[in-house]
């Protein structure tokens, strides 16, 4: 989809309407909301730096209280090339608690003894400081992530809208 957009749809629009800004409309299919591989997603971070399943991330940003309020850019990669861990990212933002333990991700008892499963309250963000993933996911830069389709169109100077989800019953 992205390849068709960048190689065919955008060039065709710009050739047909030079100097104009396009408004591209898409349904709300899951593949239209796909994130870029370097997007800020707390689920892509381990508690400690690096790890097998981590992907390089773009820089984040956060506001620091003060007079005036300042915005700081935060590199998500350490000098040795490893992706920072949740603890380091939260410490740099002044969000890592000093008086209590913070779990990587909340879990609740599963269906069988000894089994654990993700806590739905955590997954849907109703408790933003219950674990490191929820706390970081609630930050403005992580909340502001857009899908790759939207980022591509906006970078090309165009606009995009997504139709509301509709499920006929």
Describe the role of every protein-language-model region:
Residues 1-169:
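Short functional hotspots at interaction and active-site rims
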